[in-house]
Amino acid sequence: MGPAEAGFGDYVALLKPRVMSLVVFTAFVGLWIAPQPVNPFVAFCAVLFIALGGGASGALNMWYDADIDAVMRRTAGRPVPSGRVTSQEPLAVGIALSGLSVMMLGAGGNWFAAGFLAFTIFFYAVVYTIWLKRSTPQNIVIGGAAGAFPPMIGWALPTGGIGIESLLMFALIFFWTPPHFWALALFMKDDYSKAGVPMLTVTHGRKVTRCHIFAYTLVLAPFALWLGFTSVGGPLYLAVSVVLNALFIAGGWQILRRSEDQAQADGYRVEKRYFRLSLYYTFLHFLALLVQHWVGGW
């Protein structure tokens, strides 16, 4: 099959729209709750350019990871390994969107935020995808910074800089990322092993991974709660964060106490439930920040 069989949806899929949706949302929240007001049209354009930058990162990742995507069940249906899109098209799309998104964000917003976006694209495409992902079990720990930068970019658009609030938003996503992906790796270990990706489950086993998941839930909680006591926090956000972190820690504790025999016996039911919870964890925190901004904080 050649590229002629590719549809519009295949090119959209190159941008990893599900991943991009969280990037867009967290960037928007960072922008909207910043202390300086921003014109709604400028905000819309800025978020669009950040989305294009996120899509560029996804396309470059699809280009470089085509070989391992073809091996893993979870990714074998993607446009490149399935043959619907040629291997070089994601590279062209990624480079074009990288340049466009950074230049437009700089021209329409500010060059500090644009430089931040350029660094984020570079970090995800080069530092994480090309270097870390295949070389160290800490791949998702260090590489997770790429997914944590968007709210800082959003914050930098109206403010032109960095604040404690944007650093804590970064920390929330940064420390959430490892347990989120390690939970997935607990029940997808064979896929990662077959593809030669040194996830923690592959290099150190599931027992060590369970310990790391629980440890990160404990590290994550203080940063999430601390955000509630800053200028963007308030009682509503804090209440949501307390509940979410209690559930996340309880889920991590359940995972820690499980034996591999128990997990295999019930098809990794607890691990899959924890993974689903992690999908909502970050979204609900940022939604709570947005609602708190509308109703007023402390």
From Swiss-Prot:
Q: What does this protein do?
A: Converts heme B (protoheme IX) to heme O by substitution of the vinyl group on carbon 2 of heme B porphyrin ring with a hydroxyethyl farnesyl side group.
From the UniProt annotation, give the residues forming the signal peptide: none
Keyword list, A-Z:
Cell inner membrane, Cell membrane, Heme biosynthesis, Membrane, Transferase, Transmembrane, Transmembrane helix
> What miscellaneous comment appears in this entry?
Carbon 2 of the heme B porphyrin ring is defined according to the Fischer nomenclature.
Q: What is this protein called?
A: Protoheme IX farnesyltransferase
Q: How does it sit in the membrane?
A: Multi-pass membrane protein
Subunit organization: Interacts with CtaA.
* Top-rank taxon, per record: Bacteria
Alphabetized Pfam families for the sequence: UbiA (PF01040)
